[in-house]
Design a protein with these regions (language model features):
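Nucleic-acid endonuclease domains
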Residues: 1-20, 24-116
Length: 116
């Protein structure tokens, strides 16, 4: 079941067991392997939850949306080093000071499992 928009650090929840997961999509012409880096969301909430068992699903979609892959990375294989904070937005930005992060998936490529 999808969680409400802007729910921090999770996108879906199993209505049976309560399992939380985060879903990221990436448009790419290459669906056979995961990208080395993908954009995350807000850094502070993610940093606060890095010790929580939130699992990452990565869905890759090609530009024509004719095929896709699903990659899974369990929480126990996620490492603090794979979360790279981005530079905070400048003081002139609409959301000045907001800071995002990137997933550095090349640090955990061996842990990603392609399930589709």
């Amino acid at each position: 079941m999808r969680l409400p928009p802007n729910f921090k650090c999770a996108d879906v929840i199993c209505d049976f067991c309560g399992y939380l997961a985060q879903v990221k999509t990436v448009n790419t012409p290459q669906i056979e392997s995961a990208p080395k880096t993908i954009l995350g969301a807000a850094w502070r909430p993610q940093k606060e939850r890095m010790d929580a068992a939130i699992y990452l699903f990565l869905v890759l979609v090609n530009p024509h949306k004719t095929s896709h892959s699903i990659f899974y990375l369990s929480a126990d294989l996620q490492q603090p080093e794979m979360f790279r904070p981005r530079t905070p937005l400048s003081s002139t930005a609409r959301r000045a000071g907001w800071q995002g992060f990137c997933y550095e998936l090349d640090r955990v490529l061996g842990g990603l499992v392609r399930i589709r």
